[in-house]
Regions:
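Acidic, polar-rich N-terminal leader regions of halophilic archaeal proteins
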Residues: 1-131
């Protein structure tokens, strides 16, 4: 299911329609059932590549983050130390994707969105995808 968020005064709310549930399969590891991903797409080309932009915003804080997986795209586990929210951020296909985890709340997602908008000075379209 895909929902395009209305650009209301002050921007999107980042309300989370589906929370993923963490499961621990017998064979080991962790899996998630259900998902919500916010897909952010700049409406004009930013001055720097999206991966560099995301890394700069994360480095400037208030974030602790790591890109700990060897994947063909950047995937960061992010903690906003201001809001306490933890979520994943990926960069793929000209978009920045915010992946909700079980305890993620809207303020952390909104804060990263606001920092991307402030850093680029361009509008961003926001799409909410649920599974």
């Amino acid at each position: 299911m895909t929902t395009y968020l209305e650009m209301m005064t002050g921007g999107p709310s980042f309300e989370i329609p589906v929370r993923p549930e963490r499961t621990f399969p017998f064979r080991g590891g962790v899996e998630y059932e259900g998902s919500t991903t916010f897909v952010l797409c700049p409406e004009a080309d930013p001055a720097e590549p999206l991966t560099a932009l995301v890394e700069r915003v994360l480095t400037d804080g208030p974030y602790r983050y790591g890109d700990f997986l060897n994947l063909p795209m950047p995937l960061y586990l992010v903690k906003d130390t201001g809001t306490g929210d933890v979520f994943r951020v990926s960069v793929r296909g000209g978009t920045v994707r915010l992946h909700v985890l079980p305890a993620t709340e809207p303020p952390g997602l909104r804060a990263l969105y606001d920092r991307l908008v402030d850093r680029t000075g361009v509008a961003w379209a926001v799409e909410c995808r649920t599974d």
